[in-house]
Amino acid sequence: MKNRISFIQYFTTFSLIFFLNSEFALSNDISKLFGNWKHREKPVWININPDTDIGKGIIIKNDDDPTSIGKFLFIDLLSDEDRFSGKIYVPQLGRFHPMKAEISDSGNIKVLVKVGFIKRTVYFDKQT
């Protein structure tokens, strides 16, 4: 009986440590996206920030459409090692659509959106 209690305590402690480490790793990976970014082809700037371990990207400047300031461009950003997933707002569809993203070697965000047979890649450059 004593061995069983000891095993349960060990297992509980190990599980707790593993869970805390995985949460810490998740927040570290997603933190690579935090900050201000500019769309490479359009005059749109976003700020990516955490919201309880999930990243969100808010439009902070848009020279073409000032009414979009304060709206979400990215939601539900999660980390999967060196890649990220979430949803991006697609104005043509009027809704959020799943996307994949990664940080390139030059430190920029590469976002891939696939809608049916159509794929589109957009880039965001880090602003300092």
Please describe what each predicted stretch is.
Residues 29-99, 125:
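Central antiparallel beta-sheet cores of small beta-barrel/beta-sandwich binding domains
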Residues 2-12:
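Bacterial N-terminal signal peptides that target proteins for export
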Residues 1, 21-22:
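Alpha-helical architecture
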